[in-house]
From Swiss-Prot:
Co-factor(s): iron-sulfur cluster
One MF term in the entry's GO annotations: 2 iron, 2 sulfur cluster binding
Role according to the record: Required for insertion of 4Fe-4S clusters for at least IspG.
Family: Belongs to the HesB/IscA family.
Cofactor annotation comment: Binds 1 iron-sulfur cluster per subunit.
Domain of life: Bacteria
UniProt source species: Aliivibrio fischeri (strain ATCC 700601 / ES114) (Vibrio fischeri)
InterPro entries, per the entry: FeS_biogenesis (IPR000361), FeS_cluster_insertion (IPR016092), FeS_cluster_insertion_CS (IPR017870), FeS_cluster_insertion_RrpA (IPR023063), HesB-like_dom_sf (IPR035903)
Subunit structure and binding partners: Homodimer.
Residues involved in iron-sulfur cluster binding: C41, C105, C107
GO biological process, one term: iron-sulfur cluster assembly
Keywords, alphabetical: Iron, Iron-sulfur, Metal-binding
Protein name per the record: Iron-sulfur cluster insertion protein ErpA
Tagged with keyword Iron: yes
Length: 113
């Protein structure tokens, strides 16, 4: 995969957290699925869920033995972005650093392009 340009980055910190969560669930078939839906205060919302399946057309990114999955419709809004994880005063969460977002809400959960 070194010859292929990956349109989305899956950080080491996020991969490590996913690995921990998968171990807690005791299901090694789980993958982190990232998706975009309409809604939120800025028009689009990021979503994260665990999924055992990879659908036709999904893009997968491997890091530290775990897999990130993105459907083609969501990927078009995430190109050049980075899936990451943070722990802070407001709690812990996965987030996306998205260069395509022209505006984001205060919590970073929704955006517009």
């Amino acid at each position: 995969m070194s010859d292929v340009s990956v349109p989305l980055t899956f950080s080491d910190v996020a991969a490590a957290k996913v690995k921990t969560l998968i171990a807690e669930e005791e299901n090694p078939n789980l993958k982190l699925r990232v998706y975009i839906t309409g809604g939120g205060c800025s028009g689009f919302q990021y979503g994260f869920t665990f999924d055992e399946d990879v659908n036709e057309g999904d893009m997968t990114i491997e890091n530290d033995g775990v897999t990130l999955v993105v459907d083609p419709m969501s990927l078009q809004y995430l190109i050049g972005g980075k899936v990451d994880y943070t722990e802070g005063l407001e709690g812990s969460r996965f987030f996306i650093d998205n260069p395509n977002a022209t505006t984001t809400c205060g919590c970073g959960a929704s955006f517009s392009v």
